[in-house]
């Protein structure tokens, strides 16, 4: 299956050659990849000009984005705002061969809520328009993980927590990430173990596997950099992700060896087909969210 071959090449980081005369195969690949988050990664490996011409976001654009984000981080540090970058930005910046390999649309930045005064001072000093949403955090219906979403050269999503709940704004995963972080290529990021946990949490619990196969590649890249298995095991257990991690590792290893089971093959194809799609049947969580918004609408 084409989806299996695409994902295997990306995981193995192998160049991909296609017969320039094989128009049907080229069309099939570009059709599959056109909305996929791993499209640039595959296209950067591809030797076919016909396929490479379909890559809308190239290396230079991501290099510029990363320079801008590093400048934002520097200014946050100058204001002594504790922060770490999560999700796409650190992965693009430090875990992939080319920055453009890992597509992201927003820069997700987790900040320490204890520094909220200094954070808003940073926003005002840099003329970044905001709504001072901090004043809404105690509202019953306020369930968003992002404190401020600011449209600049790169969309900046400033988060106060990683996991979402209808209770308080407390988040153990966020506390771990702000406490156990390192600096990679000039950006503060959670430890590899926490970054992997966040990746798995978002894929399974937040996105319900609708984010596609990118979480498999992210996980493989993080693990390749090195993780402390004992520490990782403890964190995964805390967030009920142990079994999902084991299944993910098994899937990646089998796929790289070319011994994936039929069940795994069907699962991967499903990831490709369902990326970005919404379920017709809303989850209990989505229903509860909508009810909460009716009773106490978000203030913006």
Model regions: which residues?
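Conserved NTP-donor binding/palm subdomain of two-metal-ion nucleotidyltransferases/polymerases, i.e.
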Residues: 1-105, 111-300
């Amino acid at each position: 299956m084409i989806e299996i071959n695409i994902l295997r090449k990306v995981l193995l980081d192998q160049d991909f050659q296609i017969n320039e005369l094989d128009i049907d195969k080229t069309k099939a690949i570009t059709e599959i990849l056109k909305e996929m988050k791993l499209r640039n990664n595959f296209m950067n490996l591809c030797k076919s000009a016909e396929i490479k011409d379909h890559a809308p976001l190239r290396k230079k654009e991501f290099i510029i984005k990363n320079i801008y984000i590093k400048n934002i981080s520097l200014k946050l540090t100058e204001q002594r705002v504790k922060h770490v970058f999560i999700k796409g930005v650190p992965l693009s910046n430090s875990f992939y061969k080319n920055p453009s390999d890992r597509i992201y649309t927003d820069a997700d930045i987790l900040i320490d809520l204890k520094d909220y005064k200094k954070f808003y001072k940073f926003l005002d000093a840099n003329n970044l328009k905001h709504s001072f949403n901090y004043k809404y955090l105690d509202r019953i219906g306020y369930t968003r993980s992002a404190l401020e979403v600011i449209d600049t050269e790169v969309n900046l999503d400033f988060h106060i927590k990683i996991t979402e709940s209808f209770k308080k704004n407390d988040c153990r995963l966020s506390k771990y990430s702000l406490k156990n972080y390192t600096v990679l290529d000039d950006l503060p990021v959670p430890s590899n173990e926490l970054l992997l946990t966040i990746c798995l949490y978002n894929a399974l619990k937040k996105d319900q596997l609708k984010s596609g196969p990118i979480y498999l590649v992210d996980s493989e890249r993080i693990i390749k950099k090195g993780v402390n298995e004992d520490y990782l095991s403890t964190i995964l257990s805390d967030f009920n992700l142990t079994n999902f991690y084991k299944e993910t590792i098994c899937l990646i290893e089998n796929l790289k060896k070319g011994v994936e089971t039929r069940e795994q093959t069907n699962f991967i194809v499903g990831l490709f087909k369902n990326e970005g799609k919404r379920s017709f049947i809303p989850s209990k969580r989505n229903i509860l969210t909508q009810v909460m918004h009716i009773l106490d609408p978000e203030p913006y």
